Amino acid sequence: MEKKLNEPDESNSKELQTLDEEGKPDLSKDQEEDNKGPIKLSRKVRYILFVIIVSTELFMNNSSGLLSSSSIAIKKQFNLGDKDFGLLGTSQGIGRVCGNLLYIYFNNKLSAKVILSFSLITKGALAIIFKFSNNFNILVFVRGIVAIFRMPPSIYCGVWIDQFGIQKYKTIMMSTIPMVQTGGKMLGFLYHIIVGEENWSLGFVIQGSFMIFIGVIITLFPKIYFSAKIKAIEKTEENKERITDFEFTQRTKEIKADKKQSSLKQFFSDVYELVSNPIWSISMTGRALLFGITTTIHFWVSDYMKNVILIKDKREVFVIYSAISILGPLGGVICNSIVNPLIGGYEKKKASYAAIMLHMAEVICGMSMAFLRNKISFLILTLLYFLFDSSVIGIINGINISSVRPEIKATGFSIANLVTHSLCSGPGPFLYGFVNDKYKEKFMGAGMLCMMFICAMDIPIFIIMTIIRNRILDKKEKEKEEKLINKDNEEGKI
């Protein structure tokens, strides 16, 4: 009996091991690192899940590319100015705010699998309905409703990578998110080319069909692949024979109680914990500005090429937009694959320094874009802008999510998105259009320059974050060393 309580059951532990293709336990060093997470799965399964989760970002962003590429046709059809057209982007921002609030509420009530599949299928159905809107006000309203169901998958993507991603490649996996998002916008641009200028709304039917398809695929997977809490309960049940009845009951109660903490008091407690965490608060502020400006530039870049750079051939616009959407973020992933070994991952101190330097390069490129009228120079600088942007967002996302305990990561990320879309990416397209309408007679790149001045505000924000973060990390390291010294001293006395 004593042996059962103190020694691991070899038969049960073998069942928990990951098996390779030959059915033998795979105990490589990297695999052991991966298995420190909440789920023990083979890398093959992790990669499949990663592709499915990230593909939701690919198809959700099609609508942004569709609207951007169809700006002239939409403005002509509904007789709109830049300010009015910007309302389509702003309504999306308002919808995202509502989507964040709903996600925060339902996160602890429903499983991640249910939230993901329902959001994707509903968004797909609404995107198809978008095709039949002939009134601009209805178009703006439906655009906002569609954006509500966009947020849960978008929030969960980063959370899933942080919790279940392959340990060695987490920074790179985080960097693929902006790449896939811009790739999705480019795909929306491609829909526009396929269906034609006058039939731009048909592109939403294509997008909606893909969204429903991905949502149905997710329903086919076990829900334990999307929820660490469910897996934790199963692990406790599997190990029931190796612990006492009291321990089993306590662990199960704690896990289930944590899952049901959806009361208003608990929510405000979580929010207070997040806001009082300086690393989370400051990185969230910087991320909000950065993401808001990037979203606005993506919304307007096609219109900018047509009306400021004066590229009239829509196929040429598509080629340049595609290059920006694919090569820029892809370069960011490559950049982070080089930077990641040097900084040791986004949990380390060097990550903050890397974010500052990369963002300074991003601001320089962005400021220069507003003064250029040559399409080759514009293409090169825009590519560099999105390359640096993708790198910075990957690092900042990692710093933000990893700065809080696992139980409130999803809540923290959803609140960060709430702030981003309510204060930055929501008003961004409208602000760009407003500035452009007012000052474009004096300076054609007025809207772009305004956005880049706001983007530059992130430099002092990231510097402050770095100073505070370094102090906190130094304090934790010192406490860790003191514990080791005390432990050695106690062992020496014994």
Residue ranges and their predicted role:
Residues 177-228:
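Helix-loop-helix hairpin linking two adjacent transmembrane segments in secondary transporters
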